[in-house]
């Protein structure tokens, strides 16, 4: 398939799988039978049935779940990369598919975060979906990890004091990793 055809497959997937109007049929239409599906906020999945069960649980917990693209898709060969943002309000079922803790039913907590996903498309089917997301933000918003680390302000970084004292904090160029 061409790069443009691969981008069209991913565009449809983003809209129908991750969008506000979830279409469960898109899983059988566009996901390979043994799709590899990985995000930092959830256990790795393999196969259409596992992805379908995940989507059902995730959307039962967050009925207004909606993610959308924030930049044009980038493609090379079989790979398509998309940037996105989105989230939802936890007004539904209990949800325990998180790396830390779980949510009882209907907490009313809102999560909104961003990420980048790399998808592999082979013969018109998505064989891999690997997401790199800002899971820490979502976990904080859901109350599963503290909003601050050891009393630091929310926008702070553990290394911020070091950075302010170092030459890097004064506009010096970053060190090169070249040998």
Please identify what each model-predicted range represents.
Residues 1-179:
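C-terminal and inter-domain tail/linker signature
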């Amino acid at each position: 398939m061409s790069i443009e055809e691969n981008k069209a497959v991913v565009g449809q997937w983003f809209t129908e799988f991750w969008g506000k109007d979830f279409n469960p049929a898109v899983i059988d239409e566009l996901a390979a039978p043994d799709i590899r599906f990985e995000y930092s906020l959830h256990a790795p999945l393999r196969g259409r049935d596992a992805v379908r069960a995940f989507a059902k649980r995730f959307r039962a917990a967050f009925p207004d779940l909606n993610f959308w693209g924030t930049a044009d898709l980038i493609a090379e060969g079989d790979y398509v990369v998309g940037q996105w943002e989105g989230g939802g309000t936890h007004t539904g079922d209990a949800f325990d598919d998180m790396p830390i803790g779980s949510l009882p039913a209907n907490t009313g907590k809102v999560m909104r975060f961003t990420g980048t996903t790399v998808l592999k498309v082979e013969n018109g089917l998505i064989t891999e979906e690997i997401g790199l997301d800002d899971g820490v933000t979502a976990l904080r918003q859901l109350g599963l990890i503290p909003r601050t680390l050891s009393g630091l302000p929310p926008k702070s970084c553990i290394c911020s004091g070091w950075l302010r004292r170092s030459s890097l904090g004064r506009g010096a160029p970053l060190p090169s990793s070249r040998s």
